[in-house]
From Swiss-Prot:
It is an enzyme of class 2 (transferase). InterPro entries: Elp3/MiaA/NifB-like_rSAM, Methylthiotransferase, Methylthiotransferase_CS, Methylthiotransferase_N, Methylthiotransferase_N_sf, MiaB_methiolase, rSAM, rSAM_horseshoe. [4Fe-4S] cluster 2 binds at C186, C190, C193. The gene is miaB. This is tRNA-2-methylthio-N(6)-dimethylallyladenosine synthase. It is found in: Cytoplasm.
Amino acid sequence: MNEDMMTEAERASIAADGTDGLLGKRGKGVFHIHTLGCQMNVHDSERIAGVLEANGYVPATEDQINDNDLDLLVLNTCAVRENAAERMYGTIGRFNRVKLVRPNLQIAVGGCMAQLDRKKIADTAPWVSAVFGTKNIEDLPKLLDQNRATGKAQVQVTEQLRQFPSQLPAARASRISSWVAISVGCNNTCTFCIVPTTRGKEKDRRPGDILDEIRQCVADGAKEVTLLGQNVNSFGYGIGDRYAFSKLLRACGTIDGLERVRFTSPHPAAFTDDVIAAMAETPNIMHQLHFPLQSGSDRILRAMRRSYRSAKFLDILGRIRAAMPDAQISTDIIVGFPGETEEDFQQTMDVVRQARFSSAFTFIYSPRPGTPAAAMEQIPRDVVQDRFDRLVALQEQITEENLATFEGRDVEVMITGKLGKKDTDTHRVTGREKTGVLVHIGVPEGEPVPEIGDFVTATVTHAGRHNLLADPDVAAGQTYSVRH
């Protein structure tokens, strides 16, 4: 896609596209994948890329993307927010402008919106070549062949999972960090959520298969894995083993070469002491936790069908921090859920003050078609926006105060990249410390410059609003060291 047709997110997504020795050869076609939404979609896009490469397609270079020198554009969509359809059709429209320049370009649409609006997509956007659901990644090459042969849009969306996406080939976006899905789908019935409709009921992978995949990731160069699931800590409940997730975490601790393990997302109702103990006692399990609150009002939590209340939520946080005082805990909060009063909102603000999250993903409630909450009486937008702004201001204050506590401390950072156009002059690198905080590091003059995947221990010299800076003065006794 041309630069002037791309959003900032699209430009950033270029960096996630895999490249290999096939570049310069068109193979069956040069492709680019644009991903919207959550980490599971990022994981699925790696599988889409893997399936395409296994069938003779070649990932595009940055120059090919910028020059529209493409044979296939794939859009992996999200359905979580109300504007998901607008974003999808807007992106499909931009893809069509590329097709006007390259008439033979094929356009494929997958992901959660494809699962929901399969027929509408084909009817509304006749230039789309293929529509495939979340359970049909492996069908994409066949659909493209059929479209090429017939000239007609091909639609393949099934409700039953035939095989885990993780069993498909993968073209991983990162050499050092890997996504590993432990389950797909969700058994919860939150009244605001569309995920059970688009992803289906929860199905767990076999622990042995998960561990085999992790070992392969490490053999391929990964230093870090993130375990993925809509509700990771209900892993194993289907076979009657409520300790399966904590056992899996401990098993990750036995894998040689695996430096860091994270997971997302757990459900507070199923977060048990055995998981806390496994996190605290397994050295390579990072003390980072995304713990969705959604609301601090018990009345609203009940309306959301969230099977916990604010007191239980805060009690679990207390147990986590007692076991791991350094834990960084982030959250999700929905503002303006139908029926939310100012009193309900103030209860959310109170919980946020007590919880002191490291960060929060705050969302204005978006009604999703077919969910129970969409049929409830909605709150005026101006009221919701005012509450949203107040919550964001409170959380930003807490985040800044939390980051300030890192100043003067030594942190170990896994290097994931370099900063800006001047990185070769400033030797400034970036990465995340153990609890997930983003750290930008200035390499002191005369000290070794780390490569991506190296670990740097450095003294934090300044806390920003959303990240940390480490510009250590080695001569003054501040720390800087590199571990390969």
